[in-house]
Structure formats: structure tokens, C-alpha cells
């Protein structure tokens, strides 16, 4: 012992000579009482051999390695004093006591769960009482029982036949923290609802007797086993919540009772943080739910007194800040916190709400119309049945009430399978809509608090927004998925019911004689019948309309093909520059296509010489120009002066109009001169000709051909007969006549893509320029 006493008297500097010195001292400290020295006379020689078994040497080397960890080297290099050893001993004793308490309380808790399942949950579930919701009362208590059993088995495995110095409890909680949080989250989330359901059950005598019977049997078992008396069903249901809140307390106390050199110290710290986070997450989930329930309360349930009590300086100030922040966002004066997931789900939510509402409205209207049309349909069917049979043939007519039975079944099944689910789904949308609006209010509060420093008010706004946003994102996804499923199922059911109704109707009238299909087309047959009708005396005056329109349509007018104009070359431009003055030269601002007879095509930048600033009809919008290779008419809006000096003298306002509005296609009225104003000064002959047919009723051959006018289809039009012309939206058409053969100006004779026919005049529009 002389070297140890000498080492105790040395200073701190002399104690840290080298690593060999420390190892020799630790070696002496780790010697056990059963170790024997070969030569007891050798006191100062530390290199003496020891007489030890191989197992003792292995255990000794493990302990020595633990002592030589960096913690041991950095904490203190001096030999532990007896007081330190006593302190470590007391901590280890307290640690062992806490571990025993942890395992025993977990075992008692698991026993309580087993008794609850055996004596309460299973008997109530086996009775199958209609008004008693066992799942609503106890939620996922079976999962809570399973996770508790798993935790207990892991704790027993970590402590059984393991020395106290080697027991690691923290790793057990780190291993099970994931499922532990998920299961207790569900139970704690539904506990408040379960408590409310329990209170409602206790108000009904029959349900209260069933609960009291199960609770009494459980109390008897508690008395037999000497456990604390069970107060009521609520104290049994709250046990899982109390248990999960006790885990952080036990682990914190266990960590404080564990020496820093113990291998479980670091794991206990991580386990304590993990179970603490579990409780924080459970409380946050509970707070989110309370926040949703707070804002989900309907305003109709609030009295006038409650509404007035909310009106104060703080509420007025908060709302004014929201309005100000909203205006800043609209004017892009302030950035906004965005959540793309929420925006996507909100858009889908609003689309689903609109679709469901329209489906309910349209399907209800469809059922009503079918109901109104059913009597007439049955009557028409009976009459067709009579017509299809010749005299003397058997005509079995079924009763009216029996014939209407398929529709009654269709209406009843539609109400049950389609309208009822859709109406129930539609009633669920107002709640989320109100929460979405409240979420936007909290977002405005959060945005307004961002520029300011962290305060209690800003932290509260942030937490409320994040809680409400997270709750909406999570539940909107589930709601939208369920709503889409219900909507698609209802639409498929509606289509199936309509198909079944048509099949029943077809089978009901399958005995009606089938009419052979005509060899000629149906349009030709109809035309022949109409010709026979027009030969009658009392319709003979109006017969010219149909026949003349048919003859006019059958006349084929050869399509006019505009000749291809050669493009301008450098020689052509040189010719123009040498022949004409600078004030007569213009350039094409953009490509111009020929739209009328005697028009020419121009490419952007081509040089032209203006010969005359009007057309033969006197219109100044079309100029007669020379490109050096061809002469023709071009709209003046496509030209700009070639002389740069002249272009600079143009007024600023005129430049603004030319540059900013030259690419806009402005549609003007498509009416001819007979309604408002003439198309041009020279088109009065067209108006006169149309008016002459109205007043004099002359023959169709007296119509005068007018120049082709280029118009565009403002709306798409689908032809209903062979005499009409189908048009696509924005399709260019040639107008051949501005009225039909009877003088009706509502229908024009048009030509498009080699096809001719009549189109409604109000479907056409003319551009200000080509």
C-alpha cells in the first residue's frame, strides 16, 4: 500500500505522469478479495504474476476496459475516495429500486388492462346492444394491452439474470417508442369523446345497468386481490392516459439515480427525451382537436349575448389587422406563407363540394322529369302498340299501374342508393369550410407577426396556425378520398339504374312489330314527304321557301382560287426606290394574307409603294399598292412609312394605339344594312335586294349576287339538316347571301372548306381587318 499512499500525497501535476502509471493504479483497484499474490514479500513490484483462471481474466479485462473509457480519463485521474464509492453504491441501490418499481407498476397496469378486457369489454361486446358503442367507449384498448405486454417482456428480458451494473433500460424504450406513440395517440385522441359517450349512457337506465353490472364484477375481483377500490368506469378508462404520462417521471428519476459511468446513462437520457416528446405530441394532437371543436361550433348556436361579449377592442383591432394584411397580400406588398399540400387539397375539396351539389340538384331534377313524363310515355306506348297491330290481331295491353312499376322501383332505388348518400355527404362540407376560413384568418395573423420579433402573441399565432393547418391537411386528404369514392359509386349506380330501366322498357314493348328500315336515307324520305305536303293548296303559298332553298343549295358555284403571288426580291425593292418618292413608300409591319379578290399577300418588312389610299368602293382602310412585281389591295393597318423621319413625326398617342392594339381581333356587329347600318357605301344594293324580297315577294332568281364577304364563326354551330352548314368556333367562312330565299335575314348562305349551307346570322362576326 505504500505506492498508493505516496500517490495520494502527490499533487495533481504529478498524478498525470503517463498512461502506464494510471493503468497500474487501476489494476490494483480492480483486484478482488479472492485474488492471491504469488510472493507476498514483494510489495512495490507491480509486474508480479497473478494466479487467475481464464474466465476471471476475461471478466477483469472487460471491467478494466470500461474503466479506461475517455469518460474515466477526462473526469478524474485520481483514485475514487471511499465517499465516492459510497455515493455510487447508494445511487445503484436507488436505481435498482426504481427499476423494480417500473417493472412492478407495468405488471400491475397490464393486469388491469387484462381484467378490463375480460370483465368489461368482451361481455359488453358479446351482448351486442344496439345503442351501446363499445368501440367508442374503449377505442383501441386491445392495442394498448399488446404494447404494454411487449414493453413488460422487454423490461424483464433486460433485467433477468443480468448484473445491475450491466442492465440497460433506456434501450428498451428507444426500441419501442414508435409503436408506443402511435397507439397511445389514438387512445388519448378519442378519450374525451368516449367520456362524453359514457355520460350519455349513464343517463339511460338500461345501458347504465349493463355498465354497472360489468363494473361490479370488476370491483369484486379487485377486493379479492387486495387492490385499491375502483371508483367508476371513468377511472378505468383513464388508466392508459395516466400510465403514458408516468413514463417520463420514472425515466427521469432513473437517470438521476444512474452514475455517469454506467453504460445505461446515455441511453436513459435519450429514452427520457423520447417519452417526453411522445407526451408533447399527444398534448399537441389534443390541442389541435380542441381548436377544431372550438371553431367548428356553429354561429347559430351562439346567443346574441355571446356574440356581443366577443365584441371588444381586442377583437376589433385583430380584425382590422387582418383586413390590412389581406390588402397587402393582394397588392403584393407582403409575402405570404404557403402550403402547397393544403392548397391542392383545398382546391380538390371545393371541386368535390360543387360536383356533389350539382349532382344532387340534377339527379333530383331528372327523377322529377321522368316522373312527369311516365304517364305520357305509357300512353304513347299503348298507342304505338295499337298502331302496330292490324285489325283483329290480339293486342295484349298491360294495366297502367303494372306498367308504371319499373319507374317506381327506379325512383325508390335512386333515392336510396344515390340521393341519400350524396345528401348526407353534402351536409358534411360546411364544417370543413368554416375551418378553412378560420385557417385563413390565423394565416393572416401569422403573416402580420412575422416582421416583428418573437413575442408571446406571435408565438401563439404561429402555434394556432400550424395546429389548424396540420389538422386540416391531415383530415382533408382523408375526407377528399372518401368523398371521391362515394361520388363515383353514386354515379356508377345512377348509370346502372338508368340502363336497367331502359332494358325493362325495351322488354315491355318487345312484342311491338318492328318497322323495316327504309332503303333510302331518312333525310330523303323526309324531303319527299315534305314535297307532298307542300303540294297541298293551303300550304302552297309557302312552298317556294323549301324548294327554292333546295335548288339554291344544289347549285354549284366554282370555287375561286387566288393565284400565287411571287415574293419580293432585291431587284423589286430597287425598282420601287428609284421609281417612287420617299413619302409614297411604306413597309409591312407584319404578315398580311389576302382575304378578298384583288388583295395581295405581304411578308413582314416588304417594301411597297402606295398608288391610291382607298379602294374602288371609297373605303380608306384598303390601299392600292405596288410591290414591284405585282399590284393589289392591302389593309392600311398593316403598313407603316418607310421614311424614318416621317415615322418619328407621328403623334405619341397614335403610336401607342398602333403598337398596343394592332394584334387584337375586334369583332363588330354581323348584321347587314337592313337592320342597322350598311356594310359599306356601295353595299346598299344588297340591302335593297333583301328589302325588295321582303316587300314584293319576288322570285328567288331575282336575288343579286354580292361580293363574297369574309366572316368568322363567333360560336360553334352544328347542322341539323343537309341544308345547314356546321361551323367550328373562329372558323373563317364566305358569305354568299345575307338572307335566305324567303328574305329571312336570320339565316345566311355561307361557304366553308368547299361546303355550302345556311347558318344563323347571330353566330357570325366580322373583324375590323383581316
Curated annotation (Swiss-Prot):
<keyword id="KW-0597">Phosphoprotein</keyword>
<protein>
    <recommendedName>
        <fullName>Rho guanine nucleotide exchange factor 38</fullName>
    </recommendedName>
</protein>
<keyword id="KW-0677">Repeat</keyword>
<dbReference type="InterPro" id="IPR000219">
    <property type="entry name" value="DH_dom"/>
</dbReference>
<dbReference type="Pfam" id="PF03114">
    <property type="entry name" value="BAR"/>
</dbReference>
<feature type="domain" description="BAR">
    <location>
        <begin position="327"/>
        <end position="542"/>
    </location>
</feature>
<dbReference type="Pfam" id="PF00621">
    <property type="entry name" value="RhoGEF"/>
</dbReference>
<dbReference type="GO" id="GO:0005085">
    <property type="term" value="F:guanyl-nucleotide exchange factor activity"/>
</dbReference>
<keyword id="KW-0344">Guanine-nucleotide releasing factor</keyword>
<feature type="region of interest" description="Disordered">
    <location>
        <begin position="33"/>
        <end position="88"/>
    </location>
</feature>
<keyword id="KW-0728">SH3 domain</keyword>
<keyword id="KW-0175">Coiled coil</keyword>
<dbReference type="InterPro" id="IPR004148">
    <property type="entry name" value="BAR_dom"/>
</dbReference>
<dbReference type="Pfam" id="PF14604">
    <property type="entry name" value="SH3_9"/>
</dbReference>
<feature type="modified residue" description="Phosphothreonine">
    <location>
        <position position="34"/>
    </location>
</feature>
<feature type="compositionally biased region" description="Low complexity">
    <location>
        <begin position="37"/>
        <end position="47"/>
    </location>
</feature>
<feature type="compositionally biased region" description="Basic and acidic residues">
    <location>
        <begin position="53"/>
        <end position="66"/>
    </location>
</feature>
<dbReference type="InterPro" id="IPR036028">
    <property type="entry name" value="SH3-like_dom_sf"/>
</dbReference>
<dbReference type="InterPro" id="IPR027267">
    <property type="entry name" value="AH/BAR_dom_sf"/>
</dbReference>
<dbReference type="InterPro" id="IPR035899">
    <property type="entry name" value="DBL_dom_sf"/>
</dbReference>
<dbReference type="GO" id="GO:0005737">
    <property type="term" value="C:cytoplasm"/>
</dbReference>
<feature type="domain" description="DH">
    <location>
        <begin position="94"/>
        <end position="285"/>
    </location>
</feature>
<dbReference type="InterPro" id="IPR051492">
    <property type="entry name" value="Dynamin-Rho_GEF"/>
</dbReference>
<dbReference type="InterPro" id="IPR001452">
    <property type="entry name" value="SH3_domain"/>
</dbReference>
<feature type="domain" description="SH3 1">
    <location>
        <begin position="581"/>
        <end position="644"/>
    </location>
</feature>
<dbReference type="Pfam" id="PF07653">
    <property type="entry name" value="SH3_2"/>
</dbReference>
<comment type="function">
    <text>May act as a guanine-nucleotide releasing factor.</text>
</comment>
<feature type="domain" description="SH3 2">
    <location>
        <begin position="706"/>
        <end position="769"/>
    </location>
</feature>
Amino acid at each position: 500500500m505504500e505506492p498508493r499512499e505516496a500517490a495520494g500525497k502527490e499533487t495533481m501535476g504529478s498524478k498525470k505522469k503517463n498512461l502506464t502509471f494510471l493503468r497500474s493504479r487501476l489494476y490494483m483497484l480492480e483486484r478482488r478479495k479472492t485474488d492471491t499474490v504469488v510472493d507476498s514479500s514483494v510489495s512495490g513490484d507491480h509486474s508480479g504474476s497473478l494466479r487467475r483462471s481464464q474466465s476471471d481474466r476475461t471478466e477483469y479485462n472487460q471491467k478494466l476496459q470500461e474503466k479506461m473509457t475517455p469518460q474515466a480519463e477526462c473526469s478524474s485521474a485520481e483514485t475514487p475516495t471511499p465517499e465516492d464509492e459510497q455515493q455510487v453504491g447508494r445511487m445503484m441501490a436507488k436505481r435498482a429500486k426504481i427499476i423494480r418499481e417500473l417493472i412492478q407498476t407495468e405488471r400491475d397496469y397490464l393486469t388491469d388492462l387484462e381484467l378490463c378486457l375480460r370483465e368489461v369489454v368482451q361481455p359488453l361486446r358479446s351482448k351486442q346492444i344496439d345503442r351501446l358503442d363499445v368501440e367508442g367507449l374503449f377505442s383501441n384498448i386491445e392495442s394498448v394491452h399488446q404494447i404494454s405486454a411487449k414493453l413488460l417482456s422487454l423490461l424483464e428480458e433486460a433485467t433477468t439474470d443480468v448484473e445491475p451494473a450491466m442492465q440497460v433500460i433506456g434501450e428498451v424504450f428507444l426500441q419501442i417508442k414508435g409503436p408506443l406513440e402511435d397507439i397511445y395517440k389514438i387512445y388519448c385522441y378519442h378519450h374525451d369523446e368516449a367520456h362524453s359517450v359514457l355520460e350519455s349512457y349513464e343517463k339511460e337506465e338500461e345501458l347504465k345497468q349493463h355498465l354497472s353490472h360489468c363494473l361490479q364484477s370488476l370491483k369484486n375481483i379487485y377486493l379479492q386481490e387486495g387492490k385499491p377500490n375502483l371508483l367508476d368506469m371513468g377511472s378505468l378508462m383513464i388508466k392508459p392516459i395516466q400510465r403514458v404520462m408516468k413514463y417520463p417521471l420514472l425515466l427521469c428519476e432513473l437517470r438521476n439515480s444512474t452514475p455517469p459511468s454506467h453504460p445505461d446513462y446515455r441511453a436513459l437520457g435519450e429514452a427520457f427525451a423520447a417519452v417526453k416528446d411522445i407526451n408533447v405530441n399527444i398534448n399537441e394532437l389534443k390541442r389541435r382537436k380542441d381548436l377544431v371543436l372550438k371553431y367548428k361550433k356553429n354561429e347559430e348556436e351562439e346567443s346574441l349575448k355571446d356574440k356581443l361579449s366577443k365584441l371588444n377592442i381586442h377583437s376589433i383591432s385583430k380584425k382590422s389587422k387582418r383586413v390590412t394584411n389581406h390588402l397587402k397580400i393582394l397588392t403584393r406588398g407582403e409575402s405570404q406563407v404557403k402550403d402547397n399540400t393544403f392548397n391542392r387539397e383545398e382546391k380538390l375539396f371545393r371541386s368535390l363540394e360543387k360536383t356533389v351539389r350539382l349532382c344532387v340538384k340534377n339527379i333530383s331534377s331528372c327523377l322529377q322529369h321522368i316522373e312527369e313524363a311516365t304517364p305520357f310515355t305509357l300512353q304513347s306506348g299503348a298507342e304505338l302498340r295499337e298502331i302496330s297491330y292490324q285489325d283483329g290481331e290480339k293486342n295484349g295491353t298491360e294495366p297502367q299501374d303494372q306498367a308504371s312499376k319499373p319507374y317506381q322501383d327506379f325512383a325508390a332505388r335512386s333515392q336510396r342508393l344515390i340521393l341519400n348518400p350524396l345528401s348526407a355527404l353534402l351536409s358534411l362540407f360546411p364544417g370543413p369550410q368554416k375551418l378553412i376560413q378560420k385557417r385563413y384568418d390565423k394565416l393572416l395573423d401569422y403573416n402580420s407577426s412575422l416582421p416583428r420579433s418573437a413575442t408571446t402573441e406571435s408565438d401563439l399565432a404561429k402555434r394556432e396556425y400550424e395546429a389548424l393547418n396540420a389538422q386540416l391537411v391531415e383530415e382533408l386528404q382523408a375526407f377528399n378520398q372518401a368523398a371521391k369514392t362515394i361520388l363515383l359509386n353514386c354515379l356508377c349506380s345512377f348509370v346502372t339504374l338508368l340502363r336497367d330501366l331502359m332494358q325493362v322498357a325495351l322488354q315491355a314493348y318487345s312484342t311491338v312489330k318492328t318497322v323495316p328500315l327504309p332503303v333510302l336515307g331518312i333525310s330523303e324520305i323526309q324531303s319527299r314527304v315534305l314535297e307532298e305536303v307542300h303540294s297541298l293548296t293551303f300550304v302552297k303559298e309557302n312552298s317556294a321557301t323549301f324548294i327554292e332553298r333546295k335548288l339554291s343549295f344544289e347549285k354549284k358555284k366554282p370555287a375561286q382560287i387566288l393565284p400565287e403571288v411571287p415574293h419580293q426580291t432585291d431587284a423589286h425593292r430597287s425598282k420601287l426606290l428609284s421609281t417612287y418618292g420617299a413619302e409614297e413608300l411604306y413597309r409591312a409591319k407584319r404578315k398580311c394574307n389576302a382575304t378578298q379578290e384583288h388583295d395581295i399577300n405581304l411578308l413582314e418588312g416588304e417594301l411597297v409603294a402606295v398608288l391610291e389610299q382607298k379602294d374602288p368602293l371609297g373605303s380608306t382602310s384598303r390601299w392600292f399598292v405596288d410591290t414591284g412585281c405585282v399590284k393589289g389591295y392591302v389593309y392600311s393597318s398593316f403598313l407603316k412609312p418607310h421614311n424614318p423621319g416621317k415615322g418619328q413625326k407621328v403623334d405619341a398617342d397614335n403610336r401607342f394605339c398602333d403598337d398596343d392594339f394592332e394584334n387584337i381581333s375586334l369583332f363588330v356587329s354581323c348584321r347587314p344594312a337592313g337592320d342597322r347600318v350598311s356594310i359599306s357605301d356601295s353595299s346598299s344594293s344588297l340591302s335593297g335586294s333583301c328589302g325588295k324580297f321582303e316587300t314584293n315577294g319576288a322570285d328567288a332568281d331575282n336575288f343579286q349576287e354580292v361580293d363574297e364577304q369574309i366572316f368568322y364563326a363567333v360560336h360553334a354551330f352544328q347542322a341539323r339538316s343537309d341544308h345547314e352548314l356546321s361551323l367550328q368556333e373562329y372558323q373563317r367562312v364566305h358569305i354568299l347571301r345575307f338572307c335566305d330565299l324567303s328574305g329571312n335575314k336570320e339565316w345566311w348562305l355561307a361557304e366553308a372548306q368547299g361546303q355550302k349551307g345556311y347558318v344563323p346570322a347571330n353566330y357570325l362576326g366580322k373583324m375590323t381587318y383581316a
